[in-house]
Amino acid sequence: VTRPEEGALYDSIGPGYQTTRRADSHLAALLWDHLNGRPAGRYLDVGCGTGNYTAALSRRGGVWTGIDASDSMLQEARRAHADLSWHHASADNLPFPDSSFDGAMATLVIHHLQALPRPFQEVRRVLCGGRFVLFTAFPEQMQHYWLHHYFPGMIERSARMIPSESALRAALSDAGFTSVRVEPFHVTCDLQDLFLYAGKERPELYLDPAVRANISSFRTLCDESERVSGLGALESDLRSGAFEAVARRYASTLGDYAFVIADTEIQRHSLDH
């Protein structure tokens, strides 16, 4: 799924990853709904990591397979969920025959994929119908993260790695998907999966090194000087009460993340009749 150097990154992140990156139950429920999941369906998780969401959705139904480029992550997945199928593979060369699955998902992985639309073409190839559901952030949304105030370089670099909504729609269309729609997702204070903007309503989370260690942007895209100065400013603003004014300046109605739901031609026609 990931570029080679990022596979190595996640091999180093793997141990202890699940301490802060647990599957969020509400997010898992939304993924299942957007997939239009069926108990007898066959589903693929692209960039499954330690398999938290693969396992969470498998408990709702279906036969699940996960792929990832990180050996360490997959070892964690196999250890915790031996009953599911795990494969070391790249998203631009999926090791499955055509029409193997009834649906697929990819959560917070778009910034690690090789040049689009090739991975999307591969996902479309292995689907016999159904939907491809992505959970991602758009650069337009990230510009409204209050993290930008404290870690501007990190957020700018992170945003450059993610396709815009229009570019993502175009890549999915080029890959053969139809009826692409977007549903915004707003971070709440009870989010269990502590990814990049999970601390939107809980800024003190970013002061915890264990939380930052399992967020790839902090691991690889935040230089040491910005990390030190940003954390110092955040801690100072939290003590003084100035943080609330900073957060208000970044308020947005765009949502913090988004579900991108792409139908196959077969799925669309089945809905039309």
PLM regions and their residue ranges:
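Short alpha-helix
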Residues: 160-176, 182
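Class I SAM-dependent methyltransferase SAM/SAH-binding core
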Residues: 44, 50-93, 118
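A conserved beta-strand element that flanks and buttresses the S-adenosyl-L-methionine
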Residues: 105
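Conserved Class I S-adenosyl-L-methionine
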Residues: 181-273
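Short catalytic micro-motifs in class I SAM-dependent methyltransferases
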Residues: 108-112
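A short glycine-rich, Lys/Arg-flanked "PGG" loop and its adjoining helix->strand segment in the class I
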Residues: 117-131
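Conserved class I S-adenosyl-L-methionine
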Residues: 1-41, 52-56, 73-76, 80, 132-163, 193-197, ...
